[in-house]
Each structure stands twice: as C-alpha cells, then as structure tokens.
Regions:
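Surface-exposed helix-capping loop/turn segments at secondary-structure junctions
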Residues: 79, 142-150, 194-200
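GST-like fold's C-terminal all-alpha helical module
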Residues: 99-186
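Short, surface-exposed recognition loops or helix-turn segments adjacent to catalytic cores
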Residues: 87, 151-153, 201-203
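Long hydrophobic alpha-helical segments typical of transmembrane helices together
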Residues: 177-203
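GST-like domain detector, emphasizing the conserved glutathione-binding G-site
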Residues: 1-123
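Non-transmembrane alpha-helical segments in soluble domains
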Residues: 70, 74, 93-96, 137, ...
C-alpha cells in the first residue's frame, strides 16, 4: 500500500492519524509530497484527481477521498475503530461533515491569496465564506467540545482543521484563538492527550 501526503494538509493528516492509530506504518509506504500541484509528482501520474491525500491499495486500486481512505485503513486495523456504530455514528459523521465543509470553503481562498495578487481576489466571495465560517465554527465549537477528549474520525478532523487554520491564520485573516477560545483550548488538550495527534503535526 502507498500513501501520498502533504504535511500541511488537514485531510491527509486525518489519514495519517488513522495509520498511526492502527500501527500500520510498516504496511503502508508513506510518501511525502513536496509540491502537490507538480504534474510530475508520482501521485499525479496515475491518480486522475491529482489530489492529496492519495492512496493505492496493495491490489493496485486507487482509493479517492480522505474519508474513504481512512475507513479502508480503519477496517484493516486491529485497534478500536475510529468510526462508531449505532446512532452515535451519525452524530460523529455530522461533526466530520461540518469540519470538512469549513475546510472546503476556506482552502480555495488560501490558495487564491497565495497565488494571486490582492487586486485579483474575489473579495465579495471571501466575505460570504467568512460569514458562513463564523456560523459553522460556532456550531463546531459546541459539538466538538461536547465530545470531550475522545478520539474518533470527527475529532481527528476538527483538530486537523484548527491546527491548519492556526498555521494559515495570517493568510485567512481570522483568528480562532480570539474568536473561538473554547475550540482552541479543546484542540490543545486533544493534542496533549493523544500521541498520534502530536506525531502527525510538525508545526
């Protein structure tokens, strides 16, 4: 099995934490991608989506999307599943969807600010996304902190979101530390509690 990841990608981090949680490091060839946009990068050669994370199963089949990859690895692993069963499953997956939605809203803006001059930014769209994010982050803060210090696929993604946001705060132009201190405090406690979260983030 092969796994291509970027050290800053919150989606790739979720997969990486799943690998670490289930002690699959010896079974998965973990490849760090320096430039995800490089068309010559191995993950872009056979993967039509050309997105990070990228994963190739031992059969040679490509798996697309961080949730699918994480669930595949979770089923291979022997540790406690990161995907709960029963009615808890839908609550956890709902939190996961909120965190992913915030990332999907925000990451293109970060890329736009990185690669385009300010006069070419879509500022009205940025304002609209920021308003959505504020509402979504308020909900996420409530739901995530209600989970307590528990490790599941949703809390992993929320931690990855917050740490990534803090890394890109200057570019995003909005502080989670100032506006959502409970979410920030919860994230710090999660990182301090679970070694796999610490091991998956070098910033």
């Amino acid at each position: 099995m092969k796994f291509w990841y970027s050290s800053t990608s919150p989606f790739a981090r979720k997969v990486y934490v799943t690998i670490l949680h289930h002690h699959l490091e010896e079974q998965v060839d973990i490849q760090k991608v320096q430039v995800a946009f490089d068309r010559n990068s191995p993950h872009n050669q056979d993967n039509p989506l050309g997105r990070i994370p990228a994963f190739q199963a031992s059969s040679g089949e490509w798996l697309y999307g961080s949730d699918l990859i994480s669930q595949y690895l979770d089923e291979l692993g022997q540790e406690v599943s990161l995907f709960p069963n029963g009615m808890d499953k839908w609550h956890v997956l709902n939190i996961l969807s909120i965190a992913e939605g915030i990332l999907e809203n925000t990451m293109p803006i970060v890329a736009e600010k990185f690669f385009h001059e300010k006069e070419h930014w879509w500022k009205d769209r940025h304002q609209q996304i920021e308003e959505r994010n504020v509402r979504s982050l308020a909900l996420l803060e409530k739901l995530a902190t209600e989970q307590g210090l528990s490790l599941n696929i949703a809390t992993i993604q929320v931690v990855a979101l917050v740490d990534w946001w803090n890394l890109r705060e200057e570019v995003i132009g909005f502080s989670l530390k100032e506006n959502f201190p409970e979410l920030q405090d919860w994230t710090q406690k999660m990182n301090a509690t679970f070694d796999v979260l610490q091991a998956s983030w070098d910033f």
